């Protein structure tokens, strides 16, 4: 449900697009990306599901965990939690020997499996990194707008609440600090927006209304 003029959405830094499965959520996310690119805004569409829609719509090969230009001023990336975790470790651990040991042991894979919500947290962390004007990765491109094709409403609520959950669990330390950063991004009404996609049917509308209530 777009309850404000589209130009207001395109002036945000981050847009989360969600809705009940099957209502055209991914199509709306891509359409917003195309419109933003036509307005001259350097835009990246972020997909968090295993199925890529943006590259397929533009008849290109799957992009994977790479920022690939699929049209003028329009990029796409598919975020894989394991790749996000690996990138996070590379940014946090400065000692190469420690990084190599961690990757060889696959410890971070076991950690993700044993920590509910960690995959979602590192995924949102990558979204945050993409939205920074001062990118953390080498040669990171600066984007005007990051459009996230977020999970459907059932998972979408818990997905967007993940940083707050981790900030409450980890009361101190880097996890707490970084989770607060992510939560601030999600709740920043000036720079972040949420687009709720629905159909004129009772169940999709009710789910969208519930999600809106959860987010406010």
Regions found by a protein language model. Give the residues of each.
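Flexible beta-alpha connector loops of hexameric P-loop NTPases
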Residues: 82-83, 110-119, 166-174
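ATP-hydrolysis module of ASCE/P-loop NTPase motor domains
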Residues: 90-131
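Charged, low-complexity, helix/coiled-coil-prone segments
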Residues: 36-39, 63-77, 111-126, 150-160
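N-terminal phosphate/diphosphate-binding loop that engages ATP/GTP or pyrophosphate donors
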Residues: 35-104
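The Walker A (P-loop) glycine that initiates the GxxxxGKT/S ATP-binding motif of P-loop NTPases
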Residues: 19
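Conserved catalytic-core segment of NTP-binding enzymes
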Residues: 3-9, 23, 27-31, 38-39, ...
């Amino acid at each position: 449900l777009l309850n404000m003029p589209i130009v207001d959405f395109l002036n945000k830094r981050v847009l989360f697009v969600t809705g009940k499965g099957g209502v055209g959520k991914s199509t709306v996310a891509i359409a917003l990306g195309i419109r933003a690119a036509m307005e001259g805004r350097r835009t990246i569409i972020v997909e968090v599901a295993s199925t890529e829609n943006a590259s397929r719509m533009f008849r290109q090969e799957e992009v994977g965990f790479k920022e690939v230009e699929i049209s003028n001023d329009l990029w796409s990336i598919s975020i894989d939690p394991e790749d996000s975790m690996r990138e996070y470790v590379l940014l946090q651990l400065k000692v190469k020997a420690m990084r190599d040991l961690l990757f060889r042991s696959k410890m971070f894979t076991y950690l993700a499996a044993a920590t509910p919500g960690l995959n979602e947290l590192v995924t949102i962390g990558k979204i945050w990194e993409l939205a920074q004007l001062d990118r953390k990765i080498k040669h990171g491109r600066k984007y005007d707008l990051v459009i996230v094709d977020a999970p459907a409403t059932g998972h979408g609520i818990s997905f967007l609440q993940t940083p707050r959950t981790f900030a409450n669990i980890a009361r101190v330390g880097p996890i707490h600090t970084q989770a607060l950063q992510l939560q601030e991004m999600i709740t920043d009404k000036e720079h972040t927006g949420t687009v709720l996609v629905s159909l004129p049917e009772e169940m999709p509308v009710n789910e969208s209304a519930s999600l809106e209530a959860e987010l406010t």
